[in-house]
């Protein structure tokens, strides 16, 4: 029987365990580590990545790599919202926003803000800078 998850956003904001051991452990790892790849999660769980991917797909019907990537986008959005609130409006020039994007990318585990923006575009329909300007 598949454990159906409505959305990654629902998983991201959920705080109660589901009772599915693999599912709950993966979510706990995502909440506490800056991981990008299923191999990293599998290493922490001490399981083969192939087995983890298969188990995750059986439980959720989604690919683990897609969930991890979307999770990181949600974390970046949360961090950007928080930091933007701390920056005064007169400092919100393009240069300051680029610095904020670099800081966010590093904090959320991406190699660069360019990579983060590319992923943002895929998941949000806009680059991270354009998304940030809408706030």
Model-identified regions with their sequence ranges:
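Alpha-helical bundle regulatory/interaction domains
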Residues: 1-135
